[in-house]
Amino acid sequence: LKAPGEWGADIAVGSAQRLGTPMGFGGPAAGYMTTREAFKRNMPGRIIGVSVDRLGNKALRMALQMREQHIKRERATSNICTASALMASMTGFYCVYNGPEGLRRAAETAHLAAATVARALEAMDYRLASKEFFDTLEVEAEAAVVQSLALEQGINFYYPSEGRVRMSFDEVTTAAEIETVVSIFAAAKGKKAKAVKAVTESCVPTALRRQSPYLQEPVFNAYRSESALMRYIKKLELRDISLANSMISLGSCTMKLNAAALMQ
């Protein structure tokens, strides 16, 4: 889909769960928040930039620090930051491993699965809440009937109201699962499901499709094997410091000394 900034949005927020994080029975998952350059100083948290050290080597440094409450006082924004660092790291490495091509394939697979089900349901005279969709469909149907049939097949749809059923698809949705979904809605109308014909072309309107590049940084285009990715993760780990290496200097809310005797 087209980037929010190309639509004129100043701020965009959302969930990053779809980027490699399992559902986990509801959570946790990382989220994202992005803004135009003009508003970056109003962003919560810390923004890290690339600079050079005194020897001329590239170095990461804090380009913008907005969290410290002793500095910002009543204007501090740390209260809207969360400690989902592990989830954010998983999301980042998922993007590193898959790169722009992999993310496009995943998005297309999810969309075509939704489009295949949408076409099959419309052929059975079901009405979609919207003709324009990416990976999620909302269908007008008798929710109680569909729910009973779906549970028999081990499928849990979302039922926003008595007359609506909602479902989402992803890159691991199989043809067998698609056929099962279609058969459930066929049974709800007392019909027998016909053979499902896969949709192979995007249904997203041209005006909504993204044309601009993304994930162009070298790190998102360098690691395509499991071994290469693991070596990269290990390289980053060796740059970190922990209590296994030395005491962590007191300097901020995230750098304190936890003596081994206290970690029981």
Where are these regions (language model features)?
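Conserved C-terminal alpha-helix-loop-beta "cap" of PLP-dependent enzymes
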Residues: L55, E101-I184, A193-K197, M230, ...
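Structural motif of enzymes handling amino- and sulfur-group chemistry
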Residues: G56-R127
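Short acidic (Asp/Glu) and glycine-rich catalytic loops that position anionic groups and cofactors
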Residues: I11-G14, M66-R73, A88-N98, L128-A129, ...
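Conserved phosphate/anionic-ligand binding catalytic regions in large, soluble enzymes, centered on
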Residues: T21-T34, A38-F39, A83-M87, I241-L262
